[in-house]
Design a protein with these regions (language model features):
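Short, Lys/Arg-enriched N-terminal segments with co-localized hydrophobic residues
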Residues: 1-7
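A structure-centric signal for secondary-structure junctions around beta-strands
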Residues: 7-8, 120
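Alpha-helical substrate-recognition element adjacent to the catalytic core
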Residues: 9-99
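C-terminal cap/substrate-recognition subdomain and adjoining C-terminal extension
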Residues: 72-183
Length: 183
């Protein structure tokens, strides 16, 4: 018997800088951005995979959310607007030197998720890429997957430029036309 592989589109989603921002982080602000995300998911038949640092509030196996986590509110809004969250990227640690362990950067966790899920043919990352923007580092934790990135802004002198905006929808559409490179 042959196994059927259902091809899907996935959005790897960060929370901070996408759904909540420096100036606009009330539940109403987050809901406004989730409506934009819902429109993207509906129009391009996407499912969501969480790649945010807060992903650890979500159990990898059951997708249950830790009690008291503000992520609960986000998932309630996902449900309200029909956004299907199918998982989160794995936690991977990297050994640097003899004793230091650091979490892998998001790009490595996304690549690992893609290796584990060959059914993901098209993907887009929506993230504020904070290691480069906020930390002022020369490199980003998304450099290896940058061609799939729609970059949002966590902080701006013009608060109306922050977070997921309607203009990002066309950027997502362009990226989802690209086939993933098999890793």
């Amino acid at each position: 018997m042959c196994k059927v592989l259902i091809i899907m589109n996935v959005i790897f989603l960060d929370y901070e800088g996408v759904l909540d921002t420096f100036h606009f982080n009330s539940l109403e602000d987050i809901e406004r951005r989730i409506k934009i995300l819902a429109s993207i998911c509906k129009d391009y038949d996407c499912k969501v995979v969480i790649e945010a640092s807060e992903k650890n509030a979500i159990d990898e196996e059951t997708m249950e959310i830790a009690d008291g986590s503000w992520v609960n509110k986000i998932f309630e809004l996902f449900k309200k607007y029909g956004i299907e969250c199918i998982g989160r990227t794995p936690n991977i640690e990297k050994k640097i030197g003899e004793y230091t362990y650091l979490p892998m950067w998001k790009e490595d966790e996304i690549i690992e998720y893609l290796k584990m899920h060959p059914e993901v043919e098209h993907y887009c990352i929506i993230d504020d890429d904070d290691t480069k923007a906020i930390m002022h580092w020369e490199v980003s934790d998304l450099d290896k997957v940058r061609e799939h990135l729609v970059e949002t802004i966590y902080y701006s002198n013009n608060p109306n430029e922050e977070g997921l905006l309607p203009k990002h929808k066309s950027e997502v559409a362009k990226i989802l036309k690209k086939r993933r490179q098999y890793l």
